[in-house]
Amino acid sequence: MTLKKRSSAPELPTSLDEDEEEDSPQPLSNTPFFSMKNLIVATPIILTPLLYGYNLGFVGPYSTMYGYASNCQLYSAKKSCETLTAAKCRWFNASTYVSNTTYGEVCGWADRTTCFLKYSDEAGCLSDSACKWSYSANTCGNQVGYSSIQSGVFAGSLVIGSTMGALMGGYLTKRLDYCKSFLFIGLLSVIGNVLTHVATGLFHYWVLFVARIVLGFPLGWQSITSSHYTDKFAPANHAKTLGTLFQVSVSTGIFVTSFFGLVLGNTIQYDAASNANTMGRMQGLVSVSTLLSIFVVFLPLITKDGYSKSRRGDYEGENSEDASRKAAEEYTMTQMIGPILNGVAMGCVTQLTGINANMNFAPTIMSNLGLQPLVGNIIVMAWNMLATFCVIPLSRRFSMRTLFLFCGFVGSLCCVFLGGIPVYPGVTKSDKAISGIAITGIAIFIALYEMGVGPCFYVLAVDVFPESFRPIGSSITVGVMFIFNLIINICYPIATEGISGGPSGNPNKGQAVAFIFFGCIGVVACVIEYFFLQPWVEPEAKMTDDLDGAAVPEGKHD
């Protein structure tokens, strides 16, 4: 094959990275970014992550509301006290319980110690397993809501299902194609939410645990299917930006949960002569997720199948010969060890830097820093959502790799030097200074995470693999990320409480150690990824063979 004839052979794209695509001879779509065509293509990556985000942000508000529903001490009217269903409460005169008291009629526990009446000193309070001492208020109170172990298992239950869904998502999507996949994702989500309604009505913890696992499976599955669908059918010049909508939708869903949590949880009338209806409020929080699941069931009406087609073939007029050649470029698991290890490192940066500790336990963290739990929660989630929208213009200016590494590295430093070291007891003298520095550190970390790490992860989870290996590769990458997520969700509340010295210890100690750990992991992972993280590029020899095959044989010119 002569040089002249080689130059006439069709040139193949070598990378899916933005910087490489600029020189690609593939025709780009003239479709404007804000168009009905792009909206239809992006609907799955908007709706299904919105459902995922809502349930990701569900743990904090739901747990806080359960704490309100099981805390008899909060209620100051007989009707609201005795109609509480999450705890056995009774209305009585305090003088019949203890002789030396300034309280009159109070709401206390019918089946265990009413700690705020019985104990006024720390030693007596800590001697009773039903009680805990508050160092901030210098009072004794009952253990209410979920324990640290229950909180961790509750937060982890969704992730258990999501991990299984993510690991199986590539295989299931390949077998079912897109329309049936979205249908089953919607139906399984509805089933999971119905079980959550049942668990809430019964106040049964283990039914809730099972319900969240069932719900987690389709939410993990959708993280593969929706990203792959958008990457497949989006125009080349909009694909990366549309891909970042996954994290934008997740953060929006988290904010929606915090909004409903604030509206439902902070409007309880503790002194009203009526039923506080805490169970109904918790059911209302679940019902939004149920409604979103029903919407997902109808996604097949606007989506289309085409799993076996090459990427963006419908938009860019790719011929069937090119498509079949790409589909035939199979890679073994051994050949993909490098990209898979890249995916593991990305999972470390995405989860082991502590984002879901902030998301799931934001009410507790903000309460420890002096804010009302649900108010602090919505502030965190609003900031989280606003920061995510910044990725849309940034993704059109910088590559996914640059955003991921820069934001991950700087965010990890914030964890150590703002969220960790200054919060450790004895380092900063003023409580107000501790709160101010820690909240600033958390805010900067969340902003950097949502402007780079989170949105770029789901794009890079596809881009680091060749096209034929993407369903399996992205499933492994997202599955590993969910495993790290599970570890954090279960271990964070247990570890921070243990490091702090138990339920009555100083929570700042455990929180500081956790954030220092998060930051160190993030810094190390980002340094490793700086040298190894690259979008997939076909090996030069393979590209040359493809070009030779596409050229006209010399004999046919003679």
From Swiss-Prot:
<feature type="transmembrane region" description="Helical; Name=2">
    <location>
        <begin position="153"/>
        <end position="173"/>
    </location>
</feature>
<feature type="topological domain" description="Cytoplasmic">
    <location>
        <begin position="174"/>
        <end position="179"/>
    </location>
</feature>
<dbReference type="GO" id="GO:0016020">
    <property type="term" value="C:membrane"/>
</dbReference>
<feature type="transmembrane region" description="Helical; Name=4">
    <location>
        <begin position="205"/>
        <end position="225"/>
    </location>
</feature>
<protein>
    <recommendedName>
        <fullName>Membrane transporter D2</fullName>
    </recommendedName>
</protein>
<feature type="topological domain" description="Extracellular">
    <location>
        <begin position="424"/>
        <end position="441"/>
    </location>
</feature>
<dbReference type="InterPro" id="IPR003663">
    <property type="entry name" value="Sugar/inositol_transpt"/>
</dbReference>
<feature type="topological domain" description="Cytoplasmic">
    <location>
        <begin position="464"/>
        <end position="478"/>
    </location>
</feature>
<feature type="topological domain" description="Cytoplasmic">
    <location>
        <begin position="534"/>
        <end position="558"/>
    </location>
</feature>
<keyword id="KW-0472">Membrane</keyword>
<dbReference type="InterPro" id="IPR036259">
    <property type="entry name" value="MFS_trans_sf"/>
</dbReference>
<feature type="transmembrane region" description="Helical; Name=3">
    <location>
        <begin position="180"/>
        <end position="200"/>
    </location>
</feature>
<feature type="topological domain" description="Cytoplasmic">
    <location>
        <begin position="226"/>
        <end position="241"/>
    </location>
</feature>
<feature type="transmembrane region" description="Helical; Name=9">
    <location>
        <begin position="403"/>
        <end position="423"/>
    </location>
</feature>
<feature type="topological domain" description="Cytoplasmic">
    <location>
        <begin position="303"/>
        <end position="335"/>
    </location>
</feature>
<feature type="transmembrane region" description="Helical; Name=6">
    <location>
        <begin position="282"/>
        <end position="302"/>
    </location>
</feature>
<feature type="topological domain" description="Extracellular">
    <location>
        <begin position="263"/>
        <end position="281"/>
    </location>
</feature>
<comment type="similarity">
    <text>Belongs to the major facilitator superfamily. Sugar transporter (TC 2.A.1.1) family.</text>
</comment>
<feature type="topological domain" description="Extracellular">
    <location>
        <begin position="60"/>
        <end position="152"/>
    </location>
</feature>
<dbReference type="InterPro" id="IPR020846">
    <property type="entry name" value="MFS_dom"/>
</dbReference>
<feature type="region of interest" description="Disordered">
    <location>
        <begin position="1"/>
        <end position="28"/>
    </location>
</feature>
<feature type="transmembrane region" description="Helical; Name=12">
    <location>
        <begin position="513"/>
        <end position="533"/>
    </location>
</feature>
<feature type="topological domain" description="Cytoplasmic">
    <location>
        <begin position="1"/>
        <end position="38"/>
    </location>
</feature>
<dbReference type="InterPro" id="IPR045263">
    <property type="entry name" value="GLUT"/>
</dbReference>
<keyword id="KW-0762">Sugar transport</keyword>
<feature type="transmembrane region" description="Helical; Name=5">
    <location>
        <begin position="242"/>
        <end position="262"/>
    </location>
</feature>
<dbReference type="GO" id="GO:0015149">
    <property type="term" value="F:hexose transmembrane transporter activity"/>
</dbReference>
<keyword id="KW-0813">Transport</keyword>
<feature type="transmembrane region" description="Helical; Name=11">
    <location>
        <begin position="479"/>
        <end position="499"/>
    </location>
</feature>
<feature type="transmembrane region" description="Helical; Name=8">
    <location>
        <begin position="374"/>
        <end position="394"/>
    </location>
</feature>
<dbReference type="InterPro" id="IPR005828">
    <property type="entry name" value="MFS_sugar_transport-like"/>
</dbReference>
<keyword id="KW-1133">Transmembrane helix</keyword>
<feature type="transmembrane region" description="Helical; Name=1">
    <location>
        <begin position="39"/>
        <end position="59"/>
    </location>
</feature>
<feature type="topological domain" description="Extracellular">
    <location>
        <begin position="201"/>
        <end position="204"/>
    </location>
</feature>
<feature type="topological domain" description="Extracellular">
    <location>
        <begin position="357"/>
        <end position="373"/>
    </location>
</feature>
<feature type="transmembrane region" description="Helical; Name=7">
    <location>
        <begin position="336"/>
        <end position="356"/>
    </location>
</feature>
<feature type="topological domain" description="Cytoplasmic">
    <location>
        <begin position="395"/>
        <end position="402"/>
    </location>
</feature>
<keyword id="KW-0812">Transmembrane</keyword>
<feature type="transmembrane region" description="Helical; Name=10">
    <location>
        <begin position="442"/>
        <end position="463"/>
    </location>
</feature>
<dbReference type="Pfam" id="PF00083">
    <property type="entry name" value="Sugar_tr"/>
</dbReference>
<feature type="topological domain" description="Extracellular">
    <location>
        <begin position="500"/>
        <end position="512"/>
    </location>
</feature>
